[in-house]
C-alpha cells in the first residue's frame, strides 16, 4: 500500500511536470522563458516517472502483492529487505527535489550526459545531488530484484514448475534479472561522472585522455 501511495503522489508530480513540458512545446515561442529551467523540468520528469512512478507501482506495488499470490507463497522471501527497499525511495526523491532547488537545478536531461553535466555547465552541487538520488533509487531496485528472484526460484507451490508459472511472474522475473545486470553498470557510469566532477579524474574528459563516448556505452 505504501508503494501505491508513494507512486500515486509521484505520478501526480510527474504529470504536472509533463503538462509544463507539453505547454512549452505546444505553442510557438517560449512559455517558461528559460532554457535551463525547461531542461531541469525534463530531467526531473524522466527521473520521477521511471524511479518513483513506474517502478514503485508496477514492481513494488503490483509485484509484491501478486507474485506471492501467484506462487502460493505466504509472502516475499525477504519481507524486511522489501521494507528497506521502499524506505530508500523517499530520501532518494528528497535528494532529487533538492537537486532542482540548489543552484539552477540539474538541467542535463535524464541521462545526466557529459559534457553537459560537467563542472563547466553545472558548477554547483545540483548534478551531484541528482547522482546520489540515482544511487539510492538503484540500491532500492537491486534489493527488490534480489528479493523477487529468490522468491520466484524458492517459494513456489510443490509441483509448480517454472514452465507453469503465470506470464506476469515470468515478466517480473526476467525484468529483475535484467535490472540486476544493468543497474550496477549505470551506477559505475554515474560514479565515474561524480569523481570527474569532484576529484579531478578524467574518465569522460578527452583533454585528460578520457573517452567522451564511454558514458553513452555504459548507459
From Swiss-Prot:
Catalytic function, reaction form: 4 Fe(II)-[cytochrome c] + O2 + 8 H(+)(in) = 4 Fe(III)-[cytochrome c] + 2 H2O + 4 H(+)(out)
Coiled coil: none
Keywords: Calcium, Copper, Electron transport, Heme, Iron, Membrane, Metal-binding, Mitochondrion, Mitochondrion inner membrane, Respiratory chain, Translocase, Transmembrane, Transmembrane helix, Transport
Transmembrane regions listed in the UniProt entry: 2-22, 47-67, 86-106, 129-149, 167-187
EC number: 7.1.1.9
Entry function: Component of the cytochrome c oxidase, the last enzyme in the mitochondrial electron transport chain which drives oxidative phosphorylation. The respiratory chain contains 3 multisubunit complexes succinate dehydrogenase (complex II, CII), ubiquinol-cytochrome c oxidoreductase (cytochrome b-c1 complex, complex III, CIII) and cytochrome c oxidase (complex IV, CIV), that cooperate to transfer electrons derived from NADH and succinate to molecular oxygen, creating an electrochemical gradient over the inner membrane that drives transmembrane transport and the ATP synthase.
Assigned protein family: Belongs to the heme-copper respiratory oxidase family.
Record's protein name: Cytochrome c oxidase subunit 1
